[in-house]
Amino acid sequence: MKRVALQSSSLRSLGYDPEQQILEVEFSSGALYRYEAVPPEVVQALLEADSLGRHFNQVFKPQHYRYWRID
């Protein structure tokens, strides 16, 4: 999955497969996680957020998306 670099102190890059609704997030630590069943509008809102890290923590943690570390 192709990932794009982000301007964030906590998130380094992300990639998204809209057909499978899979989001890959690389954190600034280098850890890489895959989240499933993430709707496109949720990814778009993340990309448009003023603070990517804050938005990620406020949306993804409470929603309990299924995820796993892949690196």
From Swiss-Prot:
A Pfam family of this chain: KTSC
Recorded superkingdom: Bacteria
Record-given protein name: Uncharacterized protein PST_2887
UniProt xrefs under InterPro entries: KTSC_dom
Species this chain originates from: Stutzerimonas stutzeri (strain A1501)
